[in-house]
Amino acid sequence: MTERKSYSSNKFLLELPYLIEVQKASYDHFLQANLQPNKRLNAGLERVFRDKFPMQDAKGLNVLKYEGYFFGIPKYTITECRERGLTYAVDLWANLTLQVFEEDGEERRLKEEIKNEVRICELPQMTENGSFIINGAERVVVSQLHRSPGVSFDETIMPNGRSDYKSRIIPLRGAWVEFNTDGDMLYLVIDRKKKMPATVMLRCIGFETTNDILALFYKDTETVNIKESDINEYIGRIVFDDVIDEESGDILVYANQTLDEKLCEVLNAAGAQKIVLLSKDAEENHILIHNTLKADKCKSREDALNAIYSTMHQSQEAAPNMATAEAYFKSLFLEDPQKYDLGEVGRYRLNAKVYTKAFEDRLKELNLQKPSLDTMTMSHADFLAIIDYMVGLYNGSSGFSLDDIDHLGNRRIRSVGELLANQLSIGLTRMQRVIVEHLSLKNEDENQTPRELFNTRMVSTVVQSFFGSSQLSQFMDQMNPLSELTHKRRLSALGPGGLTRDRAGFEVRDVHYTHYGRLCPIETPEGPNIGLISSLTIFSKINDLGFIETPYRTVRDGKVDMSVEGLKFLSAEEEENKIIAQATTPMDEDGNFVVDKVKAR
């Protein structure tokens, strides 16, 4: 056997990995073909089916259920497909059950149950080499490097030198939510609709009154006895709580009003006993919330829910009733994973970013809790945490940081399995609309089977279109074995949901310090795609969340740990607080550095 020679200054401390694992592992995880239907994880193809089923009519009298999928056998071999210009694929089948109910008073009774094995589509199979044979040609699906779901915080310096901050919540599916400062105001924008004061969201999640909102951000207050003090000395201060006339029950001064001469006269004339004001320090630190509340025309939770309802429907009319407005708000963000889904990555990043130790302690006082990593929708605590973070950024408080969108902690890989799952989801969504319509129009005496309801062509068209014409599905580079291997490890920032050449600026194309050990800083095409097409380094790998990890050796007391335990794979986010030395630093065979000073970052 030929011995491999190494001319590097330091010996390899790690065996070369399986270089096309990025393709093979992703597709295997998507198919889960070797697992029994009841043992499959809620991921890939299984997750697509679970998300779309059951399908039913409006009354719930006809229900189409999913009970697992299986694959057929390829009709032709890889060689036959190449020679005859065919696609190397297998049929995807699903076990579907149509349950027909009949109304029995207020209850519903099962009338009949029809089970069928239904052909969903023809699914191209990956070869042992990590490629696909489509119409006789060998193709590769390039992995996509895209902006990760979750929350991000940005800063814009205005021409007058003022800093405006923006937070953006990006879900996998659902409405985008933005909170941004404009001067001394904090605004909420949902799905690029009309902006509204951010305190509208606080009222919607249960902090209904102005005093409730002030209590969230202003801890230091001062109670003034009006009878014993000259109230005029406090002109210009902000009122913390409503002052109520004890005799009539009328509100003399509202919370968040700024005390002036006119209000002082009203208090003295009514014989008010005391007034609670914000301390001077609190006023200076939280002017953002004070100004936002002043602009907020909503005075109750009902007003706030109606404001969101009318804004999203782009009308001046309120919801027909409170129940409709509340149900709409909950389905928009809180309770319906079909309409709003952060995804595992989005939830992980949101929890890691905004739930500081101090904020978690505050949540306990409010009887709220940090959502678990299984929670895919937004929660009341999430909205409060993001608004609190925005206030911290505005005030310049310590512990609050901005995000770098080019940092690899904010960008993740969508490999072939995830890309194909997204396409199948689109196809099944189209099919779902047709099936629900058929079920709604179905007569009681009409005996339809699941096979008759399902139109295979609608899903097949989406899959064929993806492999045949998607920007990420490319003819494999077969100049030589090395170029073939390189093509399978290539990453693209282009494609659906990614960047376009025209709007990709210099920063996103440039080499970033987090690329070290993860992306090759040299291998990128010249021309309009420069910096947008890149390649994985040899030892980098992609973790379960889609972030790129690279191996490091731990160093203790100036000695490199050469053991298996000393090897750590770290993502860009995990290495942030670590000191990283260059891999080319000279050392002896035992792992001791042979120089006194080491370059590190």
Go through the PLM ranges and name each one:
Residues 114, 490-521:
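Flexible, glycine/threonine-enriched loop-and-boundary segments that flank and lead into catalytic domains
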Residues 523, 534-537:
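Active-site proximal loops enriched in glycine and acidic residues that flank catalytic Cys/His/Asp
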Residues 243, 521-522:
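Hydrophobic beta-strand positions
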Residues 1-492, 537-601:
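N-terminal non-catalytic structural scaffold regions of very large proteins
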